Each structure stands twice: as C-alpha cells, then as structure tokens.
C-alpha cells in the first residue's frame, strides 16, 4: 500500500528506453495520491469534494469543524479499485466517530485515510485520450448500481455487480470539459479515466485512474460497444 508503487514500470521503461503507453512515473505517482491531486485540482478551479486527511495523530475536532453531522466517505489515500471499501466507509461524522475512524485505519491497513464529503448523486466515468498533444474526452458512462449501496465497495467491484449507461443529457458537455481540463493540468499522457459524482447539476471529480481497466466489465469496454 505504499505510495508510488505503480510508477515502477514506467520508470523502468524510461530507464531502458522502452516504449510504453500511459503517463510517466511522476504523473502515475501523482494520480495515486488522492489527497494531493484533489487539492491541486481544487486550487486550479476544478470542483472536487471537500477532503481532509486522518491519522491516529489527527484531531477529530478539526474534522468536525468541516463535516459535523454530515455524511463522509473514507478511503485509503493510495489505493484503487475500491480496495478495502465496505458499507462502514460511508457514515455521518459526529462526536463519537473517533473510534470508528481508528478502526478503519486498522481494517484498511494504512496509517492515513482520506476523508471526503459524500456526494449523494449519480456516478459516472469519463475516458480522456491524448493524441498529438491534444486531449479528447469521450462520452461519460454512468454506473448503475444493483443494490442500495450507492457506491462501489470491494464486493461490488470484485463481483462486477453494476451496469452501465451512456449519459446523453446536456451535463455530458460539462463533464467532458472538466475531465479534459483536469487531464491537461495533470499532464496526463495517452489516456486516463476521470470519475465524477453529480449533485444538483454540479459534477464533482472524486477519483482518477491513470491505468484504467479496459477489460469487459469496465466502462471503457462498454463505451466502445456503443459506437
């Protein structure tokens, strides 16, 4: 669960002058650190969920000043594919939440958690491609959940218990523009996937996959069956 582990392959390829697809070691490392890229994008005008870090040395009162009596989602700041996520990771933050947060630290085998405001809205994914120096955002694909758990936890991810639908409404243009701008800001090479939650017509960028799945159960695979 160390930061930067997915940068080893591009770093190795660069060292030996081997051609590869995807972003370089720096960008891949950046895209694995949810807190850092979230704050960077926020400073550059991208709408993101409010986000803070929590460790066993954190002061709960600082979190309460931001999120008291609000629902939050708690993630491992470095992991992907919803690793370690369960229904325990979305809850209302209150005075009694300290023990729950400490339990999540242990259960998720990490020393630092990302605490974000929970955006209760539809979830979608946008693939951005880079070609000859320009970025192109493809059609957004909505995640259709099959259970009452309205986010992808580990079990949902492992069993592919969801479906897809291409978003056709006018919000697609804002999603595409936002994903494209984020890719440009981050210096993405070749491709990346940008994940959003939409609430009251506002898309919140909450996750990025620098090496997204393209296998049959992925939104990317589904999207290319629709063209």
Where are the model-predicted features located?
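ATP-dependent carboxylate activation and anion-phosphoryl transfer catalytic cores
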Residues: 42-45, 169-227
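Short beta-strand or tight-loop elements
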Residues: 70, 111, 122-124, 189-192
